[in-house]
Amino acid sequence: MSAPATRVRPAVAVMVAVADAADPGASATAAVAAVSATAAGAAEPEVADHAQVTELDSGIRVVTEAVPSVRSVALGLWVRTGSRDETPAQAGVSHFLEHLLFKGTKRYSAIEIAEIFDGLGAAVNAATGKESTNLYARFLDTHTEEAFDLLSEMLLGPTYPEIDSEREVVLEEIAMYEDEPQDKVHDVLDRAVFGGHPLGRRVLGEADVISSIPVPDIDAYHRARYTGANIVVAAAGNIDHDAIVELSRRHVEPPVADSNGESHDAPDLDGAQVAFQQKDTEQFHIALGGPGIDRADERRYALTILDAVFGGSTSSRLFREVREKKGLAYAVGSYTQQYADSGLVGLYVGTREDNVEEACGIIGRELASIHADGINDDELARAKEHVKGRMVLSSESTAARMGRIGKAVLFDIPLLTLDELLEKIDAVTHEEVAELAHDFYAPESLSAAAIAPNEERFRSALAPVNEALVAA
């Protein structure tokens, strides 16, 4: 069966069993609606108190974190490939391939895969983002070898026996997504910010590509991208590092490549743009955003604090002013995204037509305020405790630990201990946050996107944010 992932920014997941594994690429509107913390995929630095890393001759990197106090294991097989690595003729192949990993291998049928995982009491899932694909599971520590064998077989041995039926499933997922403007508007914003660059494409891809792409093209993409240098095996829980390394040697045998095949061009951004899609919706779904920082930028800790203050928590300025004081929205908040060589800062609000001018007026006022003045002492202190609390609570989940160490090694980000991470957050200064607010929350640098019934009213509502957007 298939279900949407929770995501703050589209990382698309296919649900196969119980959805209690940490979603490696969280979501835009779900987190914005709950206004929990940093938008996933955003600046969530990696925590690793006892992580060990080993690189195999095949180029695969194995990273583990032992948590002896638990009786479970979270295992993830990460691949450094996603929608950014596709050509327009391949739009959506990464996500389509992720679905097909569950649909049969040389040794197991789709039904057998489901039955084996059920028999192990495992929760299994997968997710695709713009720069990564992840196949992951949680299971009892007594089933580590069986789960490892099956996951690795799925990752590297798909035979595509059910491609026609799964093609229809993905087309239905795309159709479902078209009916979810609160999610789709973030893809509209990405196109406005990144233009024709691959980061501007949506992870789900295009229906015309999915309906026609042949098996040989999918298999060629799989063979080109699912290579040793692109794969990370990550495990957290009641495990032994050497045992996971040995299982990786025995079960994960991808083609060997000299490099991970990265040939990305950084996006050349053209300044603030406006993108609108007409749809007869009850609300105006509006997203604003502009260039951010890349994932290796040391300013990511300060940006996490800034995001928490501006719209990433229930005490944030946007949540307080738009929702709590005025009741103008149910879902409102901010988020950040970091990629290999670029990033995005964004915000979202969903509001009825009668409220759109007032809501955008408040957003424009808050943008101008934080851009000019930064944040105050109370906000800085509260945001630090908020972010640290989330990090500590998250570190108690083996699935979250696996996700963090896996992403860190996949993207060559230093592994930090929890204490080191907390020190990074504590060290953030007013000046750092103010500089980021000045650089990235300048109203004139933000693009605007909307899915709504009335373009003229949307554009006129943008005047308090940036008058130039009204006629852009």
List the model feature ranges, each with a label:
Residues 59, 66-117, 298-310, 318-322:
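Active/ligand-binding-proximal structured segments within catalytic/core domains
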Residues 2-36, 55, 110-267, 276-277, ...:
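Charge-rich, well-structured scaffold segments of protease-associated domains
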Residues 52-54, 62:
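N-terminal signal-anchor transmembrane helix
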Residues 315:
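Functionally critical, cavity-lining and gating residues within the transmembrane helices
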Residues 43-44:
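Short, structured beta-strand/loop micro-motifs enriched in basic residues and often containing a Trp
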Residues 47-50:
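Short, small/polar residue-rich loop motifs at catalytic or cofactor-binding pockets
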Residues 273:
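Active-site glycine/GP-rich loop and adjacent strand/helix microenvironment
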